[in-house]
Amino acid sequence: MAYHIPRGTQDILPGESDRWQFVEQIMRETCRTYQYKEIRTPIFEHTELFARGVGESTDIVQKEMYTFEDRKGRSLTLRPEGTAAAVRAFNENKLFANPVQPTKLYYVGPMFRYERPQTGRFRQFYQFGIEAIGSKDPAVDAEVIALAMSIYRKAGLKHVKLVLNSLGDQDSRKSYREALVKHFEPRIGEFCSDCQSRLHTNPLRILDCKKDREHELMKTAPSILDYLNEESAAYFEKVKQYLNDLGIPFEIDPNLVRGLDYYNHTAFEIMSNAEGFGAITTLAGGGRYDGLVEQIGGPEAPGIGFAMSIERLLAAIDAEKTELPVNQGIDCYIVTLGEKAKDYSVSLVYKLREAGISSEIDYENKKMKGQFKTADRLGARFIAILGEDELAQNKINVKDAETGEQREVVLDELIQVLKADQKQ
């Protein structure tokens, strides 16, 4: 019987995984310079964590979670997002006791949602995300956004834009929710069933509806920016000021509400408008979540973060036809002639690898011509040719595949020679 991967998943094969490692390294190195430290949380958590943290009324909790019972009847869920687990770890491990705040965390790993698979959307997908917990400072909001934009810039993307909104504090949102209910209620029957169910539970999510986005009431809906109280408006102005100071352009979209219940104040998305996508595509999204830490059992600690899809980042790179500097080939391939040379090459290739020189030998007993073809397929910069005569003389021939130049060197000096040539 032939087995196939489950629908909505993918195999990331050698070659493609090099691209993944490259962008993940950009993420890790950017986090290092911004002083964000990696956190690794379990793949599954107690279901209640996501119900409380993400929001009972969200599509994620109601429709998309992979939930199961273990052998003792406990309800567990494969993580659909990273923030709730990071905040749970922040609380459980008392990271709030650290004298230096905010606590800056990042994560990279698979998430799981039962969604309809389509281009760039999978049921197992990979996210990079950061969380800054313990500070309510507009400068932190700007820092988080700047970090995300820095990653896209380093990955070579040019067609990205930042879209920004403020969801205000609790009082601002209360006034705005009342205005939305008043606006939509008389004609709510014209909207989809999801919007109808959200009218009195979470009317902001109506603005996020894909089915009814062209409805005339969507276009005339009140703007949350008109309902921000003085404190919320001042906070948003400061965030915008810092972004301007950093030279990061942005657009304001008062209908940007994000799909999770925990957001307040700053909300943002980073989008690609590359022609290769055919439509504007969201690459990353995030915002401030003051109150979430307390909501899932911790002390009062404001926070902000974002998550970005690694699959969509790579798709954006392809859409812009950006070449990543991967698949550069190996440093050295050792061609052997004769059994004694082959036996010696096993220890020789080990020494090269231990010295940091990526190397390979023949494991298929190919003739010399076949070994040279393999060296070419692997993109070897140098080809070291070792026969039994050379071995007896403690010599080896080294060919530079770029220039065609070939020379004989002492075997014991091979590592030194290859390292010197690598620097040229």
UniProtKB/Swiss-Prot annotation:
Its main location: cytoplasm. It is found in: Cytoplasm. It comes from the Bacteria. One of its GO terms (cellular component) is cytoplasm. It catalyses: tRNA(His) + L-histidine + ATP = L-histidyl-tRNA(His) + AMP + diphosphate + H(+). Its EC number is 6.1.1.21. InterPro entries: aa-tRNA-synth_II (IPR006195), aa-tRNA-synth_II/BPL/LPL (IPR045864), Anticodon-bd (IPR004154), Anticodon-bd_dom_sf (IPR036621), His-tRNA-ligase (IPR015807), HisRS-like_core (IPR041715), HisRS/HisZ (IPR004516), HisRS_anticodon (IPR033656). Transmembrane segments: none annotated. Pfam families: HGTP_anticodon, tRNA-synt_His. Keywords: Aminoacyl-tRNA synthetase, ATP-binding, Cytoplasm, Ligase, Nucleotide-binding, Protein biosynthesis. Homodimer. This is Histidine--tRNA ligase.
